[in-house]
């Protein structure tokens, strides 16, 4: 019996020992899992030291696909293979252009809130077109133009970063044009730089305080664009047989474009060639070399704009070798930029945001003899007939129509007020009259958009205009129709409502490669970036962050 008891107690002691070891092992494994999870989360969710926003004006996702076999491994392909890729972003308004697109991307709000509905606006008192950012209160540095972000009514990503860091973060932007440079920088940025159209120097506005010494040196030194201009010739980079993405190219001769200050529009033309992207890179590399990005206690931000549209803005034909060469060279420029970021700051410490502007200028004329549905809409004739119609109703003592600009008709508000007429009634009568014109698809009134009387068809007009600059009538023409301004200096515009595929890529900062085929809104970009930075979104943001980049996912 004693033996049995001793054996039983021994078995009991052994069982206790096994259980104790199991408990200890369980605790060790649990601790290891917790450490691994925390380490993984920290790797994925740390705040980046640098944010680089790369926006390509007129980027087309389908062109990236068409020209893919000509690209190297570390440009477009690196973005697509190593990034979190969204197949397409969508802008919620029509008539997208450079200014409205950039304002939307960097504020997270459509023009109805940001105030930026287009590159230009029309000053009817002075009877001239001016930049939406024109501001005579500020002088230009290295330019005679006057700009400021005063007409941008929303804060930007950079503004919120400056506020959160109490000014310690550096925020800069570089772009071909003033509109994209200033709108991607914002109100509180350290600086915004663009290429001046008359001297080719990197210009800015006195709204921003100070110019980095290396920008001054670049503008005035032996590396300046003016000192190299005569040697810059754009010819095919690849053998001619490599430009095989389009079967519609009929011209077998290689193209050749030169740039000289002797010719008018020298610098504007260069800004629509692949050389502008190389010049952008030259300056961006100066910032990365001397700007101390990623070394401060708070994150820094650098916004870069490339160009991927047609040469001279529009070409007389589409499917050209020029556009294929533009993308081929842009691929090399992206590769050089990413490699430099990796070397100077580290892509693991950098959030790269890559996307496009959501539109593409296409003004190809139809071949002779080819009939396509459509006609010509003449705004001047339309205004004259509308004024005669309103005179017949309200009297001939004044002109009731002020002007036309960018698919909008502006009535003479002062005359209407002096006559004590009801603006809503007059707008409605004018809209009913214009709706009868050939080629007019839809007309809506500014008053109806202001008071909330819109539907799915007219909501895009509300999103794409701001009430302070909105016309009394907004006109949408049928596809295929031409807008003829009866001005020999202005090109006839062909109405095309093509959707443009615009990819969105987030890369670096511990993000894992992934392809998302869900369409996202352009207003989701800014709040996503600020979420990764752990700061407030811009103050007019209309969307939430993309959930794939939310902290904790």
Residue ranges and their predicted role:
Residues 1-4, 43:
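Short, small-residue-biased leader/transition segments that mark boundaries at the very start
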Residues 28-37:
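Sec-dependent N-terminal signal peptides
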Residues 48-60, 79, 105, 161, ...:
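Beta-strand elements within well-structured catalytic alpha/beta cores of enzymes
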Residues 64-113, 170-174:
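Short, structured active-site-proximal loop/turn typified by the sulfatase FGly-forming signature C/S-X-P-X-R
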Residues 77, 154-163, 406-443, 509-510, ...:
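Non-catalytic, well-ordered alpha-helical segments in soluble enzyme domains
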Residues 87, 97, 120-144, 185-187, ...:
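Secreted, luminal/periplasmic, and some membrane-associated catalytic domains
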Residues 110, 115-298, 307-314, 438, ...:
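His/Asp/Glu-rich, glycine-adjacent segments
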Residues 481-515:
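Low-complexity, glycine/alanine/valine/leucine- and proline-rich hydrophobic stretches
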């Amino acid at each position: 019996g004693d033996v049995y008891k001793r054996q039983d107690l021994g078995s009991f002691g052994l069982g206790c020992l096994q259980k104790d070891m199991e408990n200890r092992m369980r605790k060790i494994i649990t601790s290891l899992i917790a450490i691994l999870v925390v380490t993984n989360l920290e790797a994925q969710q740390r705040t980046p030291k640098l944010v680089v926003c790369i926006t390509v004006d007129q980027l087309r996702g389908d062109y990236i696909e068409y020209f893919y076999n000509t690209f190297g491994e570390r440009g477009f392909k690196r973005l697509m293979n190593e990034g979190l890729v969204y197949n397409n972003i969508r802008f919620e308004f029509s008539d997208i252009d450079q200014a409205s697109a950039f304002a939307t991307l960097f504020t997270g709000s459509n023009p109805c809130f940001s105030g930026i509905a287009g590159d230009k606006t029309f000053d009817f008192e002075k009877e001239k077109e001016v930049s939406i950012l024109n501001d005579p209160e500020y002088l230009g540095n290295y330019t005679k133009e006057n700009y400021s972000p005063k007409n941008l009514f929303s804060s930007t990503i950079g503004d919120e970063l400056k506020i959160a860091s109490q000014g310690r973060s550096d925020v800069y932007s570089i772009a071909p044009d003033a509109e994209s440079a200033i709108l991607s920088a914002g109100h509180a940025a350290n600086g915004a730089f663009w290429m001046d159209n008359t001297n080719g120097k990197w210009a800015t506005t006195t709204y921003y305080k100070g110019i980095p010494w290396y920008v001054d040196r670049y503008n005035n030194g032996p590396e300046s664009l003016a000192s190299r201009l005569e040697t810059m010739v754009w010819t095919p980079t690849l053998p001619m047989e490599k430009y095989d993405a389009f079967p519609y190219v009929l011209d077998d001769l290689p193209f050749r474009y030169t740039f000289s200050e002797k010719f008018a529009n020298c610098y504007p033309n260069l800004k629509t060639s692949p050389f502008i992207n190389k010049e952008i890179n030259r300056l961006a590399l100066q910032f990365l070399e001397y700007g101390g990005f990623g070394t401060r206690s708070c994150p820094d931000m650098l916004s870069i704009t490339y160009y991927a549209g047609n040469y001279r803005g529009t070409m007389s034909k589409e499917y050209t070798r020029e556009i294929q060469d533009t993308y081929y060279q842009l691929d090399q420029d992206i590769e050089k930029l990413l490699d430099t970021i990796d070397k100077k700051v580290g892509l693991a410490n950098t959030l790269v945001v890559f996307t496009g502007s959501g539109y593409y200028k296409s003004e190809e004329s139809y071949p002779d003899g080819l009939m396509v549905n459509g006609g010509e809409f003449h705004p001047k004739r339309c205004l004259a007939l509308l004024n005669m119609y309103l005179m017949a109703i309200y009297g001939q003592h004044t002109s009731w129509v002020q002007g036309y600009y960018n698919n909008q008709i502006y009535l003479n508000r002062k005359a209407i007020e002096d006559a004590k007429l009801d603006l809503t009634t007059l707008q409605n009568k004018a809209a009913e009259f214009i709706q009868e014109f050939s080629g007019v698809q839809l007309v809506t009134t500014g008053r109806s958009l202001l008071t909330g009387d819109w539907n799915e068809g007219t909501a895009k007009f509300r999103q794409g205009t701001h009430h302070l600059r909105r016309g009394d009538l907004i006109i949408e023409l049928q596809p295929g129709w031409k807008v003829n301004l009866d001005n020999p200096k202005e090109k006839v515009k062909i109405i095309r409502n093509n959707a443009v595929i615009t990819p969105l890529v987030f890369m670096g900062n511990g993000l894992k490669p992934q392809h998302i085929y869900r369409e996202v809104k352009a207003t989701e970009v800014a709040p996503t970036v600020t979420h990764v930075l752990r700061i407030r979104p811009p103050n007019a943001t209309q969307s939430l962050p993309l959930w794939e980049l939310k902290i904790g996912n």
